[in-house]
């Protein structure tokens, strides 16, 4: 398993297992390339939607803790 795949799976599992995040099943995690070669880097991207901004913040904090130094981009919509 690629390191990026492992990180993606780990972050998604931790978010889904967190009982304090309502609607965790509506949060999606990906590890994407950002930038132009030869200066590309991997970033962790959070997408989806939640009802409370605190859920988006919690997911972002979890991702940052497990991103292995990668930047986290939080694109979770709050409705």
Which residues does each PLM region occupy?
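N-terminal targeting leaders
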Residues: 1-79
């Amino acid at each position: 398993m690629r390191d990026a795949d492992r990180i993606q799976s780990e972050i998604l599992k931790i978010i889904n297992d967190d009982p304090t995040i309502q609607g965790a099943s509506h949060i999606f995690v990906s590890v994407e390339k950002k930038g132009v070669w030869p200066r590309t880097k991997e970033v962790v991207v959070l997408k989806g939607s939640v009802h409370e901004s605190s859920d988006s913040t919690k997911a972002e904090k979890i991702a940052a803790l497990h991103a292995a130094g990668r930047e986290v981009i939080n694109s979770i919509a709050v409705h």
